[in-house]
C-alpha cells in the first residue's frame, strides 16, 4: 500500500534526531481561537530535542490576543491582563476572522459579545479600528503580530534565532483563510514551511511510539476546541521495503476523511452559561436594564463563566462570583452540573454528527474503528465524554494523547522533517488530503459553456501536495476561475464557490500569428495547477500549444524506402525554406519548437525532394491573478505599507521593553544600595559623610523616578543609573575587595610555597631542564613575593575607605603570569638517548663474511648434485 503514495518521511523517535554541523531550530504553532501554543525542535546540547516553549508567565499556552492601550501594543499575557477593564481594546478570536467577509464577522462578534470597532476594507474583509480612532489593522496584520510573538517565544526558549515554522489549521479552513495565514507570516517576517491540518498533527503524534507491522487499524480523532468540532478518520498500516540489503517495516497513515461542525465548541457551552447568568443578573438588577449592552460587564462575566465551566468538569456544582459586574453591583450565584447539561441539551446530540458523518461516508461501522482519540480542551466536559462513549459502545474512551499539546507536538515533528537543518532517521509515511474538492472553469468571448470548459480539477481528499494539468482547445484569451466543487461543503462565511480568478493572455496573439500556417491540430491552451502541501490551490502557468505541418526540401537518399510522407516521430531538424527560418528566429525567445520527420539511414544524396515536417510550438502565456473578495492577496504596495507599520510597532515594543528594563534596574539599584549602605560591611569601607551624600543623591533620583520620571524614556533612566553608579561603584568595589583581596593573597602565598617544591623536584628528577630557565622562574617568583609583601604592608597602613593600594585582580594576574612560565619550563621534553652509528669498516666486514658463507654453501650444493 505504501508504494502508491508520495511519501513524507517524518521523525518518530526523539533519539532519531541527527544534528547537522550548524545549530538549527524550527518551531510549530498551534494557532487556536483563544490560545496559541508553541513547540520547538532544537538540537542544542543540554536541551530536549522537542519541547513546548513557555511564555513570559511560565505557562505552556498563551492567550491569542492583541491589544492597544495608551499607544502601546500588548500581546499574549499582557493583553489578557487588561481584558476585563478594556474589552474594546483587546482583540481576540482573530483566527476565526481571517479571510471572512465583513458581514459574517460582524454577525459572529455580535453573537459572542465582542465590542470591536470594525470596518469593511476594500476587499470586503474586516478591518479593526483600534482605540486611537484613526488606525485600522487588517486581520492578517494582527495575526502577523501573534505569529511574531510565537517566534519570539521560540527564540527565547531555544536561545538561537528561529524563523522556520509550521502552523496548524483546522481542516475546514478554505483557500481564503489559508492564504490569509500565509500573508500574515510574510508580514511577520517568518518562513512558514507549511500549513498542516490539525488532525494530521495529532495523527502524527499518535503514531510516534506505535508499530503497525502486525496489523493495520482505523482511528478517529475527535477534536472539540473553542469554536468548532471535527472528526477525522485515519488509517494506519505498514509496508516492507529493502534498506541497505535488509527488509525493514515502514509505518504509514492516510487521512481517509474528515467532517466538522463549525458552530459547535467549548464556546457554545460557555455562551449558554453566559446567557443564563445574564438573565439571572438582570432579574436582580431590575428596572429593565440588560447587562448584555455593557461590554465591560460582559467581558467580566465571560471570564468568570470559563472558570465555572472548568470547575463543573470536576465537580457536580460550581459557584460564580463577579465583583462590580455592573453599576457597582456584585453578582454571585451557583449552578449544578445537571443544570449546565440541561442548558446545553441540544449540543450533546449535535456533538455526534461529525462522528456519524465520517462513518457514513467511509462505509465503516463503529466496530471497525480501533480507537476514538479525544483531543481539544472542550472534550474534558463529562457529559460530552459520556455521550461519545455511549455512541461508540466502549467501556473507556481513548485518551492516549495530551488534549492540549498533541497537535503542536505532532506539528513540530512535521516541521523537523521539512527543515533543511535537521535530519531524521525513523520514518512514518503521511498522506493527508484536501478537505474540499475543486473545479476549474473557463470564461471568454469564444468559450463554450459545457463540460469541456468546466470540469473537476481536484477531488475531495486528493493527497497533498499534488500537481494537475488540463488542456483546452482555444485560440483566444480567456479567464480562469477556481471554485469549490460542492456548494453544500463550503468554508465558513463563504458567499460564492469561486475563490480565485486569473486572466490568461497571449493566446490570441499566438493564434493570429500561426493561423495562416498549416495547422495539424487545433490550437490548445495547457494549464498547470498545483495543490501545495499547505492545501492552497493555484494556477502556476499556461502554455499555448501550436502544431503545424509543412512541406520542406530535404536531400534525396539513394535508397528504396516507403514514399509515404505522413508524419512520424523524430528529433528536430532545421527547415530549408526562408519562411521557416524567419519563424524560427522570431519564436526562438518565447517558444519551444520540436520537429518530427521519418527516420532514414545515412546514404548518398541525389538532390532534394519534398517532405512533410511537423513542428510543435509551446509559447508561454501570461497569467495574472485578479482574485477579488476577502481572500484576495495584498497588493505589493499594501504589503509594503503593512510591513512598515509592523516594523514601527516592533521597534516601539523593543524601546518600551528597554525602557521598562532600565527603569526596573534603576529602581532595584536604589533599593539595594540603600540597604547595603546600612550594613556593617559598608560602614567599614566608607565615611559617614560619604554615605550621607550618597543617600541624599539616591533619594533625589527616587523622587524623580516616581514623579517627573514616570514617563521618561530609556536614555533618561540609563543616564540617572550611570550617575548613581559613578558614586556607588567605588564604594561597592572597596566592599568587594575587602573579601576578595585576602583570598587572592592567600592563593598567591600558597602557590609561591608550592613552587619552591616544584623547583626542588626539577633539580632532582628533571636534570635536563636548562639551569638558566629554572633561575628565571626563581627570580620571577621572588619578584612576585617582594611585590606582594610590599603592597600588603602598604595596604595595612591605608584606611579601608581609601582607594586600595592594590587589588585582587592584580594579584591573580601576577600569579597567572608566573604559572605560565612554570608550565613552559615543565613541558621541556627529556632529550632522546643517542644511538651509536655502525662504522663503514664494520659494515664492510660483515658483508664480506656473509658473502663468503654464501659461496661455501653454493659449492656444497654443487657437490651433492654431482653425486
Curated annotation (Swiss-Prot):
Span of the annotated motif Prevents secretion from ER: 865-867
Q: Which domain of life is it from?
A: Eukaryota
InterPro entries xref list? ATPase_NBD (IPR043129), Heat_shock_70_CS (IPR018181), HSP70_C_sf (IPR029048), HSP70_peptide-bd_sf (IPR029047), Hsp_70_fam (IPR013126)
Q: Which UniProt keywords apply?
A: ATP-binding, Chaperone, Endoplasmic reticulum, Nucleotide-binding, Signal
Record's subcellular location: Endoplasmic reticulum lumen
Per the record, where are the segments of Basic and acidic residues compositional bias? 833-867
According to the UniProt record, one GO cellular component term is: plant-type vacuole
The UniProt record lists the keyword Phosphoprotein:
no
Q: Which Gene3D superfamilies match?
A: 1.20.1270.10, 3.30.30.30, 3.30.420.40, Actin, Chain A, domain 4 (3.90.640.10), Substrate Binding Domain Of DNAk, Chain A, domain 1 (2.60.34.10)
Polar residues bias located where?
560-575, 587-598
Q: Which Pfam families match?
A: HSP70 (PF00012)
Q: Extract the ranges annotated as region (Disordered).
A: 560-607, 829-867
Signal peptide span = 1-24
Q: Is the keyword Nucleotide-binding in the record?
A: yes
Q: Which CDD domains match?
A: ASKHA_NBD_HSP70_HYOU1 (cd10230)
Output the Gene Ontology terms for molecular function.
ATP binding; ATP-dependent protein folding chaperone
What is the first-listed, main subcellular location in coarse terms?
endoplasmic reticulum
Similarity comment = Belongs to the heat shock protein 70 (TC 1.A.33) family. HSP110/SSE subfamily.
By what name is this protein known?
Heat shock 70 kDa protein 17
What organism does the record attribute this protein to? Arabidopsis thaliana
Q: Specify the taxonomic lineage.
A: Eukaryota, Viridiplantae, Streptophyta, Embryophyta, Tracheophyta
Amino acid at each position: 500500500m505504501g508504494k502508491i503514495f508520495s511519501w513524507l518521511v517524518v521523525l518518530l523517535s526523539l533519539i532519531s534526531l541527527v544534528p547537522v554541523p550548524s545549530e538549527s531550530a524550527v518551531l510549530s504553532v498551534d494557532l487556536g481561537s483563544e490560545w496559541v501554543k508553541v513547540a520547538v525542535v532544537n538540537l542544542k546540547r543540554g536541551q530536549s530535542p522537542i519541547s513546548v516553549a513557555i511564555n513570559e508567565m511560565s505557562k505552556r499556552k498563551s492567550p491569542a490576543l492583541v491589544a492597544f492601550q495608551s499607544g502601546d501594543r500588548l500581546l499574549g499575557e499582557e493583553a489578557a491582563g487588561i481584558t476585563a477593564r478594556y474589552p474594546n481594546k483587546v482583540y481576540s478570536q482573530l483566527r476565526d476572522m481571517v479571510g471572512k467577509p465583513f458581514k459574517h464577522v460582524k454577525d459572529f462578534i455580535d453573537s459572542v459579545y465582542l465590542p470591536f470597532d470594525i470596518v469593511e476594507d476594500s476587499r470586503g474583509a474586516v478591518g479593526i479600528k483600534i482605540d486611537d480612532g484613526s488606525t485600522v489593522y487588517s486581520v492578517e496584520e494582527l495575526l502577523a503580530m501573534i505569529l511574531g510573538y510565537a517566534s519570539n517565544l521560540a527564540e527565547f526558549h531555544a536561545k538561537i534565532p528561529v524563523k522556520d515554522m509550521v502552523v496548524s489549521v483546522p481542516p475546514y479552513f478554505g483557500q481564503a483563510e489559508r492564504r490569509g495565514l500565509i500573508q500574515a507570516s510574510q508580514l511577520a517576517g517568518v518562513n512558514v514551511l507549511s500549513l498542516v491540518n490539525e488532525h494530521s498533527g495529532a495523527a502524527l503524534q499518535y503514531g510516534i511510539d506505535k508499530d503497525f507491522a502486525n496489523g493495520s487499524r482505523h482511528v478517529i480523532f475527535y477534536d472539540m476546541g473553542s469554536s468548532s468540532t471535527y472528526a477525522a478518520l485515519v488509517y494506519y498500516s505498514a509496508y516492507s521495503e529493502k534498506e541497505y540489503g535488509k527488509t525493514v517495516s515502514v509505518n504509514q497513515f492516510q487521512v481517509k476523511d474528515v467532517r466538522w461542525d463549525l458552530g459547535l465548541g467549548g464556546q457554545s457551552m460557555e455562551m449558554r452559561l453566559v446567557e443564563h447568568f445574564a438573565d439571572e443578573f438582570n432579574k436582580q438588577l431590575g428596572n429593565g436594564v440588560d447587562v448584555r449592552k455593557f461590554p465591560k460587564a460582559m467581558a467580566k462575566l465571560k471570564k468568570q463563566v470559563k472558570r465555572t465551566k472548568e470547575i463543573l468538569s470536576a465537580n457536580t456544582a460550581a459557584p460564580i462570583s463577579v465583583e462590580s459586574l455592573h453599576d457597582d453591583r456584585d453578582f454571585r450565584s451557583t449552578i449544578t452540573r445537571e443544570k449546565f447539561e440541561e442548558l446545553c441539551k441540544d449540543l450533546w446530540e449535535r456533538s455526534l454528527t461529525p462522528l456519524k458523518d465520517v462513518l457514513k461516508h467511509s462505509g465503516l461501522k463503529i466496530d471497525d474503528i480501533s480507537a476514538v482519540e479525544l483531543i481539544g480542551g472542550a472534550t474534558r466536559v463529562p457529559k460530552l465524554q459520556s455521550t461519545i462513549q455511549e455512541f461508540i459502545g466502549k467501556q473507556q474512551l481513548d485518551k492516549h494523547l495530551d488534549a492540549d499539546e498533541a497537535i503542536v507536538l505532532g506539528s513540530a515533528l512535521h516541521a523537523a522533517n521539512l527543515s533543511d537543518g535537521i535530519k531524521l532517521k525513523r520514518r512514518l509515511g503521511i498522506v493527508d488530503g484536501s478537505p474540499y474538492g475543486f473545479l476549474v472553469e473557463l470564461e471568454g468571448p469564444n468559450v463554450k459553456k459545457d463540460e469541456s470548459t468546466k470540469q473537476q480539477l481536484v477531488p475531495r481528499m486528493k493527497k497533498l501536495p499534488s500537481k494537475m494539468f488540463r488542456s483546452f482547445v482555444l485560440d483566444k484569451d480567456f479567464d480562469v476561475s477556481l471554485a469549490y466543487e460542492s456548494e453544500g461543503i463550503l468554508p465558513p462565511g463563504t458567499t460564492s464557490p469561486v475563490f480565485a480568478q486569473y486572466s490568461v493572455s497571449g493566446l490570441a496573439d499566438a493564434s493570429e500569428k500561426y493561423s495562416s500556417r498549416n495547422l495539424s491540430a487545433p490550437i490548445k491552451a495547457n494549464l498547470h495547477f498545483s495543490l501545495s502541501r499547505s492545501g492552497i490551490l493555484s494556477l502556476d502557468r499556461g502554455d499555448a500549444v501550436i502544431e503545424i505541418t509543412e512541406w520542406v526540401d530535404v536531400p534525396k537518399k539513394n535508397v528504396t524506402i516507403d514514399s509515404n510522407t505522413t508524419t512520424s516521430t523524430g528529433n528536430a531538424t532545421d527547415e530549408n525554406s526562408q519562411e521557416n527560418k524567419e519563424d524560427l528566429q522570431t519564436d526562438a525567445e518565447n517558444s519551444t519548437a520540436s520537429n518530427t520527420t521519418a527516420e532514414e539511414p545515412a546514404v548518398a544524396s541525389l538532390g532534394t525532394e519534398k517532405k512533410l515536417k511537423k513542428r510543435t510550438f509551446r509559447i508561454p502565456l501570461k497569467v495574472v491573478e485578479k482574485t477579488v473578495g476577502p481572500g484576495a492577496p495584498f497588493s505589493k504596495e499594501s504589503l509594503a505599507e503593512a510591513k512598515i507599520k509592523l516594523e514601527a510597532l516592533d521597534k516601539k515594543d523593543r524601546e518600551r521593553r528597554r525602557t521598562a528594563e532600565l527603569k526596573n534596574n534603576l529602581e532595584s539599584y536604589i533599593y539595594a544600595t540603600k540597604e547595603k549602605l546600612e550594613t556593617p560591611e559598608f560602614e567599614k569601607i566608607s565615611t559617614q559623610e560619604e554615605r550621607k551624600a550618597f543617600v541624599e543623591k539616591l533619594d533625589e533620583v527616587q523622587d524623580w523616578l516616581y514623579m517627573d520620571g514616570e514617563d521618561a524614556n530609556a536614555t533618561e533612566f540609563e543616564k540617572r543609573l550611570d550617575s548613581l553608579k559613578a558614586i556607588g561603584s567605588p564604594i561597592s568595589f572597596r566592599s568587594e575587595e575587602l573579601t576578595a583581596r585576602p583570598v587572592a593573597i592567600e592563593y598567591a602565598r600558597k602557590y609561591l610555597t608550592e613552587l619552591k617544591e616544584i623547583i626542588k623536584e626539577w633539580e632532582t628528577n628533571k636534570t635536563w631542564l636548562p639551569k638558566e630557565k629554572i633561575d628565571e622562574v626563581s627570580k620571577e617568583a621572588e619578584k612576585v613575593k617582594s611585590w606582594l609583601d610590599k603592597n600588603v604592608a602598604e595596604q595595612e597602613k591605608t584606611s579601608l575607605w581609601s582607594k586600595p593600594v592594590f587589588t585582587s585582580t592584580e594579584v591573580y594576574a601576577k600569579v597567572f603570569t608566573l604559572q605560565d612560565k612554570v608550565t613552559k619550563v615543565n613541558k621541556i621534553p627529556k632529550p632522546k638517548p643517542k644511538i651509536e652509528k655502525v662504522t663503514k669498516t664494520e659494515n664492510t666486514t660483515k658483508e664480506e663474511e656473509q658473502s663468503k658463507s654464501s659461496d661455501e654453501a653454493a659449492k656444497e650444493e654443487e657437490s651433492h648434485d654431482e653425486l
